[in-house]
Amino acid sequence: MPTVIIEMWAGRTEEQKATVIRGITKAFEEIGIKSEHVQVIIHEVPRSNWGIGGEQASKIFP
């Protein structure tokens, strides 16, 4: 049973997250895995809690 964990910045709409979940599930279906066996977990992280090159992402991408 594949489990895909996505870490991304907070702020996407419910529709956008649903699109990501459907797309990942479809990719697994294309290689023969039933959709009911695919789990997708989205962790939303505030930009202030995400570091890039020693800086907070909220400062790099305001």
Q: Whereabouts are the PLM-identified features?
A:
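A domain-level signal for the structural core that forms small-molecule/cofactor-binding pockets
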Residues: 1-62
